[in-house]
């Protein structure tokens, strides 16, 4: 009985250790998308630059991204904020941490104490993602072009079902032994990806998203030509196990980073 109990406890310890190890390696990303008017932009940007991002860094979040649309949407002005979290616990606790930070509250006073008659923004949309194990951490792009000229391509692949979404993710991250995966092809051609991830909470699911980055529009076009003409992609896209309409909607959003963006 003692031996059996010892073995059971040992097995549980191994399982718990494995679970902790996996969780420790997984990064979660939040996109906060501000819907706001042009007149509201200065207040939100000052809050992000002077209060929010410094407070996040004090809380252990090393890099935060802030992006705008290259071609503004005149009907729905947006500002994108990208925050990587080391765990779901860190994500869950962040608002409490900020609320206890007096320096944050002073620096963000105009934004935080805005009246309903003079709002700081229209609304905030939130997307929560889990990093793929093939790229468990975000990467700061290794680009040398001016930030205002860069093209950050945010892609969203929606699937018609959870099963087909899993198939698309497998094509994206595993592929096959001979040709590799989509992610491998991106890496081969140096697409300077910030992240690859699965949406775990948002208005568009099931869904995978990723962000690749380029010095400018010509650089973007040249990289995609390499990808589309890659012989491994020619095979991978036609494999029967990855057929069957795994993507029902492919959205592309073209962004550029603001000067105070870490990404």
Task: Give each language-model segment a name.
Residues 1-26:
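Bacterial Sec-dependent N-terminal signal peptides
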Residues 23-106, 110-233, 243-263:
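Short S/T/G/P-rich N-terminal loop/turn motif that feeds into the first structured element of a domain
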Residues 236-238:
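Short, membrane-exposed interhelical loops at transmembrane-helix boundaries
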């Amino acid at each position: 009985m003692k031996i059996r109990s010892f073995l059971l406890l040992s097995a549980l310890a191994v399982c718990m250790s494995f679970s902790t190890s996996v969780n420790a390696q997984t990064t979660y990303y939040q996109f906060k998308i501000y819907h706001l008017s042009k007149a509201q932009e200065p207040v939100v940007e000052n809050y992000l630059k002077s209060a929010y991002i410094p407070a996040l860094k004090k809380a252990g979040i090393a890099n935060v991204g802030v992006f705008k649309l290259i071609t503004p949407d005149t009907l729905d002005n947006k500002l994108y904020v990208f925050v990587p979290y080391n765990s779901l616990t860190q994500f869950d606790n962040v608002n409490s941490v900020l609320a206890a930070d007096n320096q944050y509250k002073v620096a963000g006073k105009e934004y935080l104490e805005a009246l309903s008659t003079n709002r700081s923004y229209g609304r905030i949309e939130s997307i929560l993602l889990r990093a793929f194990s093939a790229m468990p951490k975000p990467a700061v792009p290794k680009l040398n072009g001016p930030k205002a000229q860069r093209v950050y391509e945010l892609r969203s692949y929606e699937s018609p079902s959870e099963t087909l979404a899993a198939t698309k993710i497998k094509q994206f991250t595993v592929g096959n032994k001979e040709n590799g995966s989509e992610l491998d092809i991106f890496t081969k051609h140096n697409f300077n990806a910030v992240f690859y991830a699965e949406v775990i909470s948002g208005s568009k699911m099931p869904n995978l998203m990723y962000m690749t980055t380029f010095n400018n529009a010509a650089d973007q076009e040249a990289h995609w030509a390499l990808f589309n003409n890659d012989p491994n992609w020619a095979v991978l896209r036609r494999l029967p196990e990855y057929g069957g309409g795994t993507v029902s909607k492919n959205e592309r959003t073209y962004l550029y980073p603001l000067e105070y963006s870490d990404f």
